[in-house]
């Protein structure tokens, strides 16, 4: 269930369209990426993209054909308006737009919000209200299933804009009206990128991306921390009366080594303080579910032949995790004999699979290290995990993490995806 638009049209060629998009991107302050088959304009987080693909006409003399789309939820009505206005400025002939909100035709922003985006939001509120008080765990709204899953807290819902009690959304609508909730739930609910837009963009980054680690740890931490502070400071200048997450602002200032500059003003008061990555988060690789501290950074480690998924927090004393996935050519995956030479080998059954693990001492750059090796089988899939630490005391933490490993069957994954769509 989403709101968006699709379009088709004709263009002189990719170069002319890309050049026009570049000019618009510079004017509107959005980013542009172009490849040989199309382009993407990034207007805001939460899927705030205008995507388009092109192909030549049937005959050499025919114009090129272009098609594209923008999905406007959960980002908000401001994104929808911005996407329509970008289409207005692009050299696309015979432009045909399928806009379920009707905004491309009538251009009444308030009408679009009330008839479509607020109706969409009320539906989500009703879903949460029905589940309230049942002790529901793992409920997510508008969450990207391709990334980590935050820690479960019963009777709450995870969203890109923060964690809420299931009853809280309905209470807010009853107390303050749908407009108030929309201004907090949608990242871009206004006509323009106003103070609330910058505040909400910072709130999204605090909840979803910030590791609450020093900026000196990595370029990723430096960029995220700086963006949060810049957005909150800009929001305060545009509207000094707007409530802001001031405690989080001061916390990130300390991490970034920046002096707080916000003048006194109202604080955004909420039950849950920002930061999914302050707690444990669960990563999905196929059927495997691996729960690690949220502060760990992920990257793909390239090897001469292949590579591995790698998680580390940059600290010398914390385990470094690597994961590889393999698939049996026929039948079910089986454990290998590689673990037989390890110390303390043990195993356990999982719902939908099984695992075995042990540990060994290794040398790396002349330094003694301890490494746990774990194999997980789930149907035809075999997952090989290693966790390397500097001392034997780190094996206890690794054992706890391995104790939390689970696998998800295809049936369960289908049910999860269906729940997210509903």
Regions picked out by a protein language model, each given a short descriptive name:
Residues 1-278, 283, 304-311, 315-322:
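Acidic (Asp/Glu-rich) sequence patches and key acidic residues
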Residues 11-19, 330-337, 395-396:
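Short, conserved charged micro-motifs
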Residues 12, 37, 314-316, 326-330, ...:
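Short, flexible beta-strand-to-coil junctions
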Residues 22-35, 97, 294-302, 340-355:
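Short secondary-structure junctions
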Residues 284, 335-391, 415-422:
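Signature of long, low-cysteine stretches enriched in small and polar/charged residues
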Residues 284-337:
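Secretory pathway targeting signatures of secreted, lumenal, and periplasmic proteins
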Residues 388-419:
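Mixed-charge, glycine-accented linear interaction segment located at domain edges/termini
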């Amino acid at each position: 269930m989403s709101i968006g638009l699709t379009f088709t049209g004709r263009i002189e060629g990719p170069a002319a369209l890309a050049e026009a998009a570049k000019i618009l991107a510079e004017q509107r302050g959005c980013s542009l990426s172009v490849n040989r088959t199309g382009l993407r304009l990034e207007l805001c987080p939460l899927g705030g993209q205008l995507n388009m693909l092109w192909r030549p006409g049937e005959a050499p003399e025919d114009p090129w054909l272009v098609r594209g789309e923008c999905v406007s939820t959960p980002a908000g009505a401001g994104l929808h308006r911005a996407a329509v206005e970008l289409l207005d400025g692009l050299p696309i002939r015979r432009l045909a737009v399928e806009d379920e909100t009707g905004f491309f035709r009538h251009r009444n922003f308030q009408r679009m919000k009330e008839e479509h985006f607020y109706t969409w939001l009320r539906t989500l509120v009703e879903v949460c209200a029905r589940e309230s008080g049942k002790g529901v765990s793992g409920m997510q709204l508008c969450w990207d299933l391709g990334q980590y899953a935050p820690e479960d807290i019963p009777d709450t819902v995870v969203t890109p804009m923060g964690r809420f009690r299931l009853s809280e959304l309905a209470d807010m609508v009853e107390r303050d009206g749908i407009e108030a909730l929309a201004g907090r739930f949608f990242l871009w609910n206004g006509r323009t990128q106003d103070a609330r837009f910058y505040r909400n963009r910072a709130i999204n980054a605090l909840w979803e991306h910030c590791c609450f680690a020093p900026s000196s740890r990595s370029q990723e931490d430096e960029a995220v921390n700086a963006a949060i502070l810049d957005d909150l400071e800009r929001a305060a200048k545009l509207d000094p009366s707007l409530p802001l997450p001031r405690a989080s602002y001061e916390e990130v200032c300390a991490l970034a080594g920046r002096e707080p500059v916000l003048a006194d003003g109202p604080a955004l008061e909420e039950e849950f303080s920002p930061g999914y990555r302050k707690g444990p988060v669960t990563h999905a690789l196929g059927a495997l579910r691996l729960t690690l501290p949220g502060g760990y950074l992920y990257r793909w480690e390239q090897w001469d032949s292949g590579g591995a998924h790698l998680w580390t927090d940059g600290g010398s004393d914390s385990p470094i995790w690597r994961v590889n996935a393999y698939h049996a050519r026929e039948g079910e995956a089986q454990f290998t004999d590689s673990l037989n030479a390890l110390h303390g080998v043990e195993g356990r059954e999982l719902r939908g699979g099984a695992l075995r693990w042990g540990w060994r001492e290794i040398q790396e750059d002349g330094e003694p290290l301890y490494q746990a090796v774990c194999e997980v089988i789930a149907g035809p899939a075999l997952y090989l995990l290693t966790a390397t630490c500097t001392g034997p005391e780190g094996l206890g933490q690794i054992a706890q993490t391995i104790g939390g490993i689970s696998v998800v069957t295809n049936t369960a994954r289908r049910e999860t995806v269906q729940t997210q769509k509903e």
